[in-house]
């Protein structure tokens, strides 16, 4: 019997950036989680080339998270996970324990002052490489805005501890922006564009959806837009980042502020080609490819703002 049992094939959405421990990749509509190396040779080849590290954007610098992520992505790091979370003083002290900080008590106190943004990064010799990036680029350009793991021995444990915390969210007078799987390579730029458009990030987390959940979330578009099936395919093609945002001028205080309409305008028309004509400075005009891979999903109707943020930051977090 000479019929082939296994055959190599190329999956466009599966790239080297997506292959690391804990990643979820989609192959022929099936979501597969990478839980172990296939053999010792693969483990040896990937152990340094796909090393992971943790970066925490400090509470006072959350508005700079997009710039930090963009700097990391430009330097060759892949973003594995993102979460905005609040740490207690004890949580923060545990996180930085054994780090080389000259003022661990002060750093712990700073990390406990409000929500921070944790970013799990993957790259070549990631721990040392990101420390160099912080020293040579981030601190000179943005100030002392991040804390990062400084030991490969405990980077994974610190990442697991941070991402075990519940995601921060306000769940009131906010809107939802999803950086789609096809735009994750530009995650930092997209997040920065949203913040520059007058929004403050009040929650953020990475997600992967199976087809049932994606259909449920996008059901309002079923029978309304011809691209519905393709929209579901896009949302289930890999990890994405959901952002809860409020108007910057609120200072996180809430209030009836038209945040849904304002975010929809900042994102621009669903078709990037139209967006580039009508709203050339919009997020979709800058980062979208087509009506499906248009960089971001945003809440369309004011009455859905609370529903969509609850779906990701309460229901899926339960």
Task: Write out the residue ranges for each language-model feature.
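Non-catalytic terminal and connector segments of soluble metabolic enzymes
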Residues: 24, 44-318
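Extended amphipathic alpha-helical elements
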Residues: 1-47
